[in-house]
A protein has these predicted regions:
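Non-catalytic alpha-helical scaffolds and adjoining flexible linkers that form interface surfaces
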Residues: 1-20, 24-234
Length: 234
């Protein structure tokens, strides 16, 4: 096969010297594979197979679990720390948990690549995350419909909550006002003043896909925020 652009989403030890890996690839989406020998001391592939590092990979195997053959770097690893690192870990965990195996999601791949470029800049993180989340929801046919459950227009003066069954909005509290939701429905996900509402909508839309098990990366971000508040108040 032609070398495929990819990023590592998750890796865990397998047997003595190998690893089970989850990859996000350009044309095949999420791919599960065995990386043989990468845990062996001195393995050249060990240093390449790292999160946030652009890769070229090839694999063999017709089942769900592939065997990696080629692992080459195709660029510099994104250098992330603190909140930027936690946002990157969140993106990796989100994609691992929600993407079906081998569903082509080239737009998700493009927005993930753009996110890694944005994460070192604090002012660009939220917008990058929302664009990735929206592209993921679109790929999974789970993006909210910015209407009422019966297809009616949202009233700018009424507050709404997302109905998970219909993926539309019904009146409810505390909710978001119809004017804000109509702006989001027009695609203004990172317009000024919409950072909080867009985060609330994507989180609500992703919740049914994630199920009841919490994301570890969200807990780490909560702990970081608490430490910052405690430090600011001391």
């Amino acid at each position: 096969m032609t070398p495929e652009p990819a990023f590592l989403l998750h890796k865990r030890p397998y047997r003595e010297t190998s690893a089970l890996v989850e990859l996000l690839t350009l044309s095949q989406g999420r791919v599960r594979a065995v990386a043989q020998g990468v845990q062996r001391p001195g393995s050249r592939s060990r240093g390449r197979l790292q999160p946030f590092s652009p890769l070229h990979v090839t694999w063999v195997g017709g089942g769900e679990l592939k065997r990696l053959r080629l692992m080459e770097s195709r660029g510099a690893t994104a250098l992330l720390a603190g909140e930027g690192l936690l946002c990157g870990l969140y993106a990796n965990e989100l994609l691992t948990r929600t993407l079906p195996v081998e569903l082509p999601v080239s737009e998700v791949f493009a927005f993930y690549t753009a996110l890694l470029e944005a994460l070192p800049r604090p002012d660009a993180r939220a917008g990058g995350l929302r664009r990735l989340e929206v592209s993921l929801l679109e790929a999974l046919d789970a993006l909210p419909r910015f209407t009422t459950p019966d297809g009616g227009e949202l009233d700018p003066q009424v507050r709404y909550v997302l109905d998970a069954f219909s993926r539309a909005f019904r009146p409810g509290q505390p909710g978001l006002d119809g004017r804000t939701l109509r702006l989001l429905g027009a695609g203004d996900w990172d317009a000024p003043g919409l950072a909080g509402p867009s985060k609330a909508v994507t989180r609500a839309a992703l919740a049914p896909l994630l199920g009841s098990r919490p994301l570890r990366s969200r807990e780490l971000m909560r702990q970081l925020a608490e430490r910052r508040r405690a430090k600011a108040g001391s």
